[in-house]
Amino acid sequence: MTQTNDKLVIAGREFDSRLMVGTGKYADFQQMVRAIEVSGAQIITVAVRRVNISDRGKESLLDHIDLKKYTLLPNTAGCYTAEDAIRTCRLAREAGLSDFVKLEVLGDEKTLYPNNEELLKAAKVLLAEGFTVLPYTSDDPIVCRRLEDMGCAAVMPLGAPIGSGLGIRNPYNIQIILESVKVPVIVDAGVGTASDAAIAMELGCHGVLMNTAIAGAKDPVAMAEAMNCAVRAGRLAYLAGRIPRKLYASASSPLTGIIG
């Protein structure tokens, strides 16, 4: 399978790019727009709290995003209870943003780890109300399977804490999740550089979502291009199939016909 016909499919929607990007922490909107363009991403996540829903007459980041070109993924960043997350998603829908949502329910301000108990409660309500839910969760295979069983369109386990740049800290759990669920697995949080994104894709993940790794780089536009290449390279390497790891050497040239 080539990358030409290798689509990411979420809830029946097809995407050519497996990289999803956020919109926060950029120096200005112009830098954000350029980085998004270079990243090749088609799904753009936006914190509902950062969108001026009450006064659309004021400048908003949505003024700089071509909604005909990109799929908007409103997120519930900053929510610490199921009730708050549910209310935020309803606001996004009422404002005409989308019912295709990234659900976050955080446990505390220090780690920004997900509160899975509250996450499951929020997901149940939102799914019943017809939302397409993509939940940010821990790298717990059991929780991911429960989210899939509930009807979530994908699961989004963290690679490491949000904004930490620590990379994929527990690839073994990610592999177990990949074996445990049939919906797309998208690594969300922890990516720091291009090699981290490539590793996630080489493991077999269906996509990677990031913000700080690009927006916080010295040159966000250059990093966006690097992430674009890394995600595509990692996916292609996964499809190609790596050679098995072995303890001892294996000659790459035939030993027959050796002189002497």
Curated annotation (Swiss-Prot):
Its name, as the record gives it, is Thiazole synthase
Species in which this protein is naturally found? Geobacter sp. (strain M21)
One GO molecular-function annotation for this sequence?
thiazole synthase activity
Which Pfam family, any one, appears in the UniProt record? ThiG
Asked if the record carries the keyword Cytoplasm, the reply is yes
Q: Where is this gene product found?
A: Cytoplasm
Please give the biological process terms from Gene Ontology that the record holds. thiamine diphosphate biosynthetic process
Q: Which InterPro entries match?
A: Aldolase_TIM, Thiazole_synthase_ThiG, ThiG
